[in-house]
Amino acid sequence: MRPHSPALRKLLRLALVSPLCGLASFERRPQAPGLPAAPLTPMDRALPDWRGVVLRANRWSTQPFNPSYWSEPKLGPYGWSLRNAAIVDGELRLRVTEKASGQIQAWDRAFATRGLWEVDVTLPSMAPGLIAAPLWIYNRITLDESDFEVVGVKGLFVTLWTKVDGQHVAVWDNGGAPILSGDLSGRRLRLGMAYEAGRSVTYFVDGRPVARATPADAKGGHFPTGPQKAYLDLWVAAGLDPGWAGVWRPMREGQSLEMVVHGYRQA
C-alpha cells in the first residue's frame, strides 16, 4: 500500500468529511445547524458513470481515483498492475490476468466518517481463488474496514474490521453466512454501504438492506470509528490460505477475467 503521507496524517487528525455527489464533485457541503442529517439510503435512479474520470498513477492530490501498481502479501505473484484498471466507454473495467490483479482507490479527500457508497457492477466469471471486491472502504492508518467481497464460487460476503491490540482484526462477519450464496458469475448487482463511524454499517443489495452491524454486534464491542474511503478491485488470493477462497488455477497467457463497474456514487 502507498506510504502514509504527511498530508494524509494531517487529514486523518482532522477527520475530514468530504461527501461526494457523483464521481467528480468533491466539494464539502456542511450540514446546516439544527437540521437532521440526511438519511443514508440508496438512490432509485442510475448511478453516475465514469465518464470524465482519468486513471493515472500517483495523482493523489489532483485525481479522484488512482490505480494501484504494487504488490501485497495476500496477492502472491498477482500484484496490482496499471494495465488492469481502465475506463472504457464510461465504465470501469478491472481485470485479472496471469500474474496481475487490478485495483483503484479514491483520493484522500474522499475520507468520510459518515456516508453512503454505491456501485452498479457486473461480476466476472468467478473461479476458486478469485476475489471480486467491487466496493469496500478502508483506512490504512486506523485499520477500519468494511467489505463487500465475492469469494471464489462461494458467494457474496460482508465483513467489518478494525484495529484491536495493534492488529487488523475481523470483528463482525454476518455470522459467516454469505449475503448471496453460490457461483455469482456474470451477475449484475447494485451494492450499497452506509457507514456511520462508531455507530453502524448497513449493507444494501439492489436497494434492499440485507445486513446491519453495530458496536453491540461486534466482537468485544470493537467497531470502526475513523474516516474511510473507497477501494474497488479484482484479485487473486494466491498469498492466502486456499481454505478461504479455494485453489486458484493459473490461466493461459493472454487470458483474462474482467469485472465491469457501470456506475459509482459516494454521498
Describe the function of each predicted region.
Residues 94-159:
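Secretory/extracellular carbohydrate-interaction modules
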Residues 1-21:
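N-terminal secretory signal peptides
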Residues 107-117, 179-187, 223:
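Extracellular/lumenal carbohydrate-interaction signature centered on repeated Trp-anchored short motifs
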Residues 187-201:
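Localized edge beta-strand/strand-to-loop motifs within extracellular or lumenal beta-rich domains
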Residues 200-259:
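Aromatic sugar-binding interfaces of carbohydrate-active proteins
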Residues 48-81:
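Short, tryptophan-glycine- and acidic/Ser/Thr-enriched carbohydrate-recognition patches
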Residues 166-188:
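Short, aromatic/His-centered strand-loop micro-motif at the edge of beta-sheets
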Residues 83-99:
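Short carbohydrate-recognition loop motifs
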